[in-house]
Amino acid sequence: MPGVVRLLALLLVPLLLGSARGLHNATQRTFQIDYRRNRFLKDGQPFRYISGSIHYFRVPRFYWKDRLLKMKMAGLNAIQTYVAWNFHELQPGRYNFSGDHDVEHFIQLAHELGLLVILRPGPYICAEWDMGGLPAWLLEKKSIVLRSSDPDYLAAVDKWLGVLLPKMRPLLYKNGGPIITVQVENEYGSYLSCDYDYLRFLQKRFHDHLGEDVLLFTTDGVNERLLQCGALQGLYATVDFSPGTNLTAAFMLQRKFEPTGPLVNSEFYTGWLDHWGQRHSTVSSKAVAFTLHDMLALGANVNMYMFIGGTNFAYWNGANIPYQPQPTSYDYDAPLSEAGDLTEKYFALRDIIQKFAKVPEGPIPPSTPKFAYGKVALNKLKTVEDALNILCPSGPIKSVYPLTFIDVKQYFGFVLYRTMLPEDCSDPTPLSSPLSGVHDRAYVSVNGVAQGILERESVITLNITGKAGATLDLLVENMGRVNYGSSINDFKGLVSNLTLGSKILTNWEIFPLDMEDAVRSHLGTWGGRDRGYHNKARAHSPPTYALPTFYVGNFTIPSGIADLPQDTFIQFPGWTKGQVWINGFNLGRYWPVRGPQMTLFVPQHILVTSTPNTIVVLELEHAPCQDGGPELCTVEFVDKPVFRTVQTHRHAN
């Protein structure tokens, strides 16, 4: 406590030095900074926010109100959200603001519940989200310098902000909405460039669209170099840090860049992110609560990142360098679990908050009920190779050398690369990616015989066998673009040449695969079992690997039972790695042999009681029924999430 008192004394010094700014105009709603007394003013009255992060793009719209109400009942008076550009503009000029993408409705819903909103519209957001929220199609300009004053980048950003920010303007606090502050960029000091022209460009565009009086801010880590590049005059500089940080040092660093004004931790970490193959990250409730208490005792404004993490459905997860993709779950060990459940951490933080602010009275919405629907048998349907006419109805693109995903306008998912072996490989011959050009994972086969896997940065050579003229296929998976640091220009596919022995492989056929359309529209026309020359050859595949294959099954939820359907979790006993859809909804990636995530969250709104629910699994390596009957090939619905880490090896799985 003496340290807190000493820091408080240091921080009060500017009261004698500052000049009064941000005076209240009683005729309108205002949210301003009182630089004289180091605080925010809301409608002229002192105000301190206690906020939590929630990402609308990681929580189904069906559950927005439930999660927001739980946040309010914890004592929060504000929520913070990013806006993920690529979530709204998946293809250039084609915008989606409906359904789960309706950010305006999300913000309005927070307003209706009495929550203020701290908006972080990027354009870059990090967030462990694919490419940090930047759309992959920006990479069609191969030399583009992202997050800079590169003219190509600024032109795209300018157009996007011209679409997004006018939608946000009516939702600003001054206009009757809940948005009190708006962040410019995101932790820009951590990026390779220190481009003040870029920040000034954003500052001007935000003012153009939102007004000169909007309160703009930046966020950077507690490091002087980071703040030097991330802060800009006219943008209020805030910091972010984790439990256990020295508060005196952290806030004095903010004071170096903002001598007066409120103390703000824009990202106080309640947990941490996961990577495939690593232990599930946890942070003790005691540590989070202790530091939160001390920050609130100082009068600081705090946003807890995350208050609920949510889910990276489909292909939306990001990755870090050295290449480490994040899993489907973004649980984050947050106060509300991935499924929105109340945790011990939730109540620990609520107890701290109520010492400093009024916590709403009344019942807290309970954790949603979960149901274990049990095991569901799946039948083998088709391999990816056998379904090419459905997955790529327009046929392949031909090129002497490999093309990237961006070259063929495939932004997510999978591309199959095909060529012919130029010579006999009777003895095992190295298929190599000398420049680690497989981004990110290639499932290799010769004439329908699975050979093994090439993996970015870890497995760059694989011995294969086959006759001259045999078909060499590589199904390449985009496992998520890098979302942080200097490597966010993350091209996918075969980004450099492959060699067989000493020869460069040429004359490729490239199949961009539309998995979503095939799963949603053509499932019933796929026919029965595999057929053709592949069948005989598959018997000789290495036992660890098989061709990437689709499996399908159905299960029925009784319609006469009250409160069904309910949320559930799906697990994959005996399966290896792949993608799963339920009723056409892409739940995301499973990889139980790597962990730590063993189950995938299944929200109730994608389930039905009127007809059977259809499960489609794309197993990329080896299914439990690969060598046995379909009765061995099951998935299981359970009522609790499971996280654990399995020992991994660089050469397998």
Curated annotation (Swiss-Prot):
| Biological process, per Gene Ontology | galactose catabolic process
The entry's active site is 187, 267
Q: Which Gene3D superfamilies match?
A: Galactose-binding domain-like, Glycosidases
GO terms of molecular function: beta-galactosidase activity
Disulfide bond residue pairs? 194-229, 625-633
Residues carrying covalently attached carbohydrate according to the record: 25, 96, 246, 463, 497, 554
One GO location term (cellular component): lysosome
Q: Source organism's superkingdom? A: Eukaryota
| Entry's localization field | Lysosome
Give the InterPro entries listed for this entry: B-gal_1-like (IPR026283), BetaGal1-like_ABD1 (IPR048912), BetaGal_gal-bd (IPR048913), Galactose-bd-like_sf (IPR008979), Gly_Hdrlase_35_cat (IPR031330), Glyco_hydro_35_CS (IPR019801), Glycoside_Hdrlase_35 (IPR001944), Glycoside_hydrolase_SF (IPR017853)
Catalytic reaction list: Hydrolysis of terminal non-reducing beta-D-galactose residues in beta-D-galactosides
Q: What class of enzyme is it?
A: hydrolase
Q: Which residues form the propeptide?
A: 23-27
**Entry keyword set:** Disulfide bond, Glycoprotein, Glycosidase, Hydrolase, Lysosome, Signal, Zymogen
UniProt EC number: 3.2.1.23
Tell me how this protein assembles: Homodimer. May form higher multimers.
- Family the UniProt entry places it in: Belongs to the glycosyl hydrolase 35 family.
As for what it does, the entry says: Cleaves beta-linked terminal galactosyl residues from gangliosides, glycoproteins, and glycosaminoglycans.
What protein name applies here? Beta-galactosidase
Q: Point out the gene that encodes the protein.
A: GLB1
